[in-house]
Amino acid sequence: MTERRIIHIDMDYFFAQVEMRDNPKLKGKPVIVGGKASSRGVVSTASYEARKYGVHSAMPMSQAHKLCPNGYFVTSNFGAYRETSAQIMSIFRSYTDKVEPMSLDEAYLDITELVRPDLPASKIAQYIRKDILEQTHLTASAGVSYNKFLAKLASGMNKPDGLTVIDYQNVHDILMTLDIGDFPGVGKASKKVMHDNGIFNGRDLYEKTEFELIRLFGKRGRGLYNKARGIDHSEVKSSRVRKSVGTERTFATDVNDDEEILRKVWELSGKTAERLNKLQKSAKTVTVKIKTYQFETLSKQMSLRDSVSSEEDIYNIAYLLYNDLKDPDVPIRLIGVTVGNLEQSTNKNMTIYDFI
């Protein structure tokens, strides 16, 4: 049986990172997302600069203001977070259909079928993080292991912008020395019960019998017994069927030079073709999306008589669509190429004259 390979990706201080990306003046500042300092709400996310003051998620905004009076308090912009999350999830699904989102900024990926001797899971995780950085200008931390529990644990070990692998060689040492509060799923209430019963780290948990843990925690006790041993048989659950494949890029500065933009369209067409080839699919629709310097999103789609899968075919159509969309007086900050209506590949090469 092939050993499973699971990646857990967790974006670093996601909401705050998006705010700092979209407003560069906030970069490096103690950013606190959730609302005004005087509001009755709670903190959604705090940047690492704000966390140095003791600010953390779910803290009342009033308390955050007392701890960090010079912080930059920002109202949540869920539209921007959802849009960025959709980009990130699209990146995940360009690698595998086995994706289980846990929230806007977190997901499990089962990449077992992608791993080869020359392409270990850690390398795939590096590629995914690189794609996220290039396409969204945000950093992510990744954990790689042979089950979901250990992958999630690993993703939190070297934040921010970290990559950690837990394998059979190091799992025991990591779990035995792990503070009990750092076990995924152990909250404040559980931690207190643990401490009251002499459980302060993984070794203490490991030394408890399954019966003792069930007595203390009910059905959860069996799961805790297994976690202390690095055991987790749960599957990555994905009910989504892939309907499209695409790639986007945000330019470092706003651009209105056709030559530069079309070079990027060629690059995106190539990446999209690679992913179609990996899936052994071809597409009957091509879409080009642009986002202007004013953050207005425009898109244009073409439906095709015959499906396409090559870099050249996708570029030829994307070229036509871009020319329909462009306004030479309006710089753009993002461009994307997406193909949809997927079917099994026929590998028929076409020319631009088939589409006009």
From Swiss-Prot:
Q: Please state every residue range assigned to the domain named UmuC.
A: 6-187
Q: Which CDD domains match?
A: PolY_Pol_IV_kappa (cd03586)
Catalytic activities:
DNA(n) + a 2'-deoxyribonucleoside 5'-triphosphate = DNA(n+1) + diphosphate
List this protein's GO terms for biological process: DNA-templated DNA replication; error-prone translesion synthesis; SOS response
Site, Substrate discrimination: residue positions: F15
Task: List the active-site residues.
Answer: E106
**Per its UniProt record, what Pfam families does this chain match?**
IMS, IMS_C
Q: Does the keyword Amino-acid biosynthesis apply?
A: no
Please tell me one Gene Ontology term that the record gives under cellular component. Answer: cytosol
Per UniProt, the keywords (alphabetical) are: Cytoplasm, DNA damage, DNA repair, DNA replication, DNA-binding, DNA-directed DNA polymerase, Magnesium, Metal-binding, Mutator protein, Nucleotidyltransferase, Transferase
| Family stated for the protein in its record | Belongs to the DNA polymerase type-Y family.
Membrane is among the record's keywords: no
Q: How does it assemble?
A: Monomer.
Q: Which residues bind Mg(2+)?
A: D10, D105
Function (record text): Poorly processive, error-prone DNA polymerase involved in untargeted mutagenesis. Copies undamaged DNA at stalled replication forks, which arise in vivo from mismatched or misaligned primer ends. These misaligned primers can be extended by PolIV. Exhibits no 3'-5' exonuclease (proofreading) activity. May be involved in translesional synthesis, in conjunction with the beta clamp from PolIII.
E.C. designation(s): 2.7.7.7
- Which HAMAP family does this UniProt record tie to the protein? DNApol_IV (MF_01113)
Q: Name one GO molecular function term.
A: magnesium ion binding
Q: How is the cofactor bound?
A: Binds 2 magnesium ions per subunit.
The protein's name is: DNA polymerase IV
